[in-house]
Amino acid sequence: VGSDLPKAQLGLNIGADWKGFDLNLFFNSIIRDAWNNSKFYTDFFPLWTGNHGTQLLDAAKAYEDYLRTGYYASDVPAPTVDNSNSENEGSQYYIEDGSFLRLKTLTVGYTLPRKIQDKLFLKNARIYFQAQNLFTITRYSGADPEGLGYPYALPRQYTFGIQFGF
């Protein structure tokens, strides 16, 4: 059916500093196909119980068209009430382009001028702001292409900090 082993894993770190300010960006990327576990559990898995995913409606419409025309034109499996088609079995339907590019870490900092540090009896005094997982560019329809199989995206995290020495 496919493999979610990465074809490539990439990283890019960009850093710059100017007049006491520093900026650092870290991007990571993976190029691969991915099993969409969210799609697996929401589209057809509960077919014989409870609520149903909206893909079921598309498949039902395609089946009505099939009865009329003899041609089944849908990208979703043909469901049955008794699950005899094994809609929830692994198939190409659940494989997607799981490639992504993510801004993993952004850090902006400012190092205090030497004169101010000397007055405060400090060394290497720096304040900074750091953010993680700010954005992801992907065609993957699940929650997160990096944490496959989990129903939640990676959280954004924000940190303010102070570094100094004596």
Please state what every model-predicted region is.
Residues 25, 127-129, 162:
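Membrane-embedded beta-strand positions of outer-membrane beta-barrel proteins
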Residues 20-24, 115-116:
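Repeated loop/turn-to-beta-strand initiation elements of outer-membrane beta-barrel proteins
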Residues 59-71, 88-90, 134-166:
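C-terminal beta-signal and terminal closure region of outer-membrane beta-barrel proteins
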Residues 8-10, 19-21, 99, 121-125, ...:
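Outer-envelope beta-barrel architecture signal
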Residues 2-7, 93-102, 152-154:
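Short sequence motifs at beta-strands and strand-loop junctions characteristic
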Residues 17, 28-30, 130-134, 165:
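Outer-membrane beta-barrel pore domains and translocons
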Residues 8-14, 103-108, 156-162:
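Hydrophobic, lipid-facing positions within transmembrane beta-strands of outer-membrane proteins
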Residues 30-121, 125:
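Extracytoplasmic gating/loop element in the C-terminal half of outer-membrane beta-barrel translocons
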